[in-house]
Amino acid sequence: MAEAPLPPPPGVEVDPDFEPFSRPRSCTWPLPRPEFNPSSSANSSPAPSLQPEPAAGNVDFLSNLSLLEESEDFDPAEALGVCGDFPCQDIRQLQPPVPQQHPQQQAGTLCAPSVPSALSPASSPSPLGAQQPRKSSSSRRNAWGNLSYADLISQAIESSPEKRLTLSQIYDWMVKSVPYFKDKGDSNSSAGWKNSIRHNLSLHSKFVRVQNEGTGKSSWWILNPEGGKNGKSPRRRAASMDNNSKFAKSRGRAAKKKATMQSSQDGSSDSPGSQFSKWPGSPSSQSNDDFEAWSTFRPRTSSNASTISGRLSPIMPEQDDLGDADVHNLVYPPSATKLTSTLPSLSEMGNSENMENLLDNLNLLSPNTSTQSSPASMMQQSGYLFTSPNTSLGSPNSEYRKYSYAQTGMNPVSQMPMQTVPENKSGYRAVGQYPVPAGLLKELLTSDSPPHNDILTPVDSAVSQANSRVLAQNSLMAPSSVMPTYGSQPTHNKMSSHPHSHQPPPNHPSVNGRTMTHNSGINRLSTVKTSVQVPMPQPIQMTSMGSYPVNSCNGYGRVGIVSIHQEILPSDLDDMFIESLDCDMESIIRNDLMEDGEADFNFDSILPNQSFPHSVTTTTHSWVSG
């Protein structure tokens, strides 16, 4: 071995990377370390009598060290005795300081720092053999040996005479039997390993807990008679919404149900009612995700009132089905062909944008007067779906006597008591709070015969068809007590709503003379006498032939059965008093037509002679505040 340079004098500090080892670590666990004294170094020529002994001494030391590692309960004094028999003690005393050996080489040697480089070949394997205990020590599982906590607990239980121990007795056995835990029995240092013991007792299937017979005593821990698993059992977890199989099954069923409902809705999208269900502001225009909770946990019934989306497909019922008492006679007039319809409520038409979109789609092309339009022709691509009742004018229906209007003599404006028919048709209430009878717009615009017999009664045989068209086109709203006068030319009549110069009341939107009023406010009628200054929201229909007062019943404007001659129409109605109309103003004000505003319709159309080839043009005016 080449000689290393001389070390510094004894008073000089040593490099911290190559700090000398202390002597007590040479023979203690886990690995003996040689002591390097900087004041004394090995000599290249030690005593000759000590040269053949290091090899044999290393063999004995390694064998004793391997026995020491496998033994769990070892005595530190025995380890010191082994190292005391080793010749390195005498070598250290006899050797003078030798500066030639390098510190790294000294660190590589194990307990023989003074072995010279000129040793015999028998002593040369000793540094290599000293590395083997270091490899074997790295395989130790725990600080006390190769035994695990479960093995120690098993030994503790087996060592007891009754083959059972409580938790505190297991703690005591650990402190008494395992040297590593002897100085760790106090409360501060025992928290960690005691917690590990509790975990191993509860997680291993080889340990079984037995209830103690005595009251207030700890349970016994015994070994599993069936043996159990040597390893740990799978970790137990509390049932939650993520790993609960019951919740997963219910969630899967809800997903399947949603898929089937969506497929059924897609299959029914070809119905005529679905082509206008996505108009802006309608409840159907919202996505199906908004009602996912409803569709998942609450099944929809067949009732139209419980339908969430508000989409109603037209259904062709039989003639006999509509003869029941639950069908409102005002909503469904007696006719040969009937068709239910869906109309958006006026509360959804509260802004001008929705109204413009609605009225732009309301283009009804009228056929010639010689042809009668069928109900199917009125299913237009528009926001409203108007259906026609019986457009043919026949004999007065026998059920018409159900409308109990008081017929007066020649007074154009008189008190008319009404019989309120309860509305039992729950399916029609799903339309909205402001329903409009079906077929009115088409019947007023396209029919060349007088309107239906529940609108105008054939009490005056002298009424011609032209005059009935003038009557239909001159239907208007009279929001005040003063009724303006309109001309009777059939080609220049316009239908509009004109607020009077007096303070206007809450206007009721009128579509071709029919008022869309709240279906609960007008039912509560009271005998309130009104004067000129009191605004009257009752709709008045006027023609050149006479005046037909219109009453309201459940939100529908109906023409009273009044036989009036053509010559009795006053030329100026500005000074006429409206004294005998009964109206509950409080209910009208309370149940305002709109929350956001009020609707104002204006249908400007020029009527040609005996035909209506034009479409109705609509404009939206500014809202009149109520």
UniProtKB/Swiss-Prot annotation:
Residue spans binding DNA: 144-238
Compositionally biased tracts (Low complexity): 37-48, 101-133, 262-277
GO cellular component, one term: nucleus
Protein's cellular compartments: Cytoplasm; Nucleus
Protein name stated in the entry: Forkhead box protein O1
Biased composition (Pro residues): 1-11
Post-translational modification: Phosphorylated by AKT1; insulin-induced. IGF1 rapidly induces phosphorylation of Thr-28, Ser-240 and Ser-303. Phosphorylation of Ser-240 decreases DNA-binding activity and promotes the phosphorylation of Thr-28, and Ser-303, which leads to nuclear exclusion and loss of function. Phosphorylation of Ser-313 is independent of IGF1 and leads to reduced function.
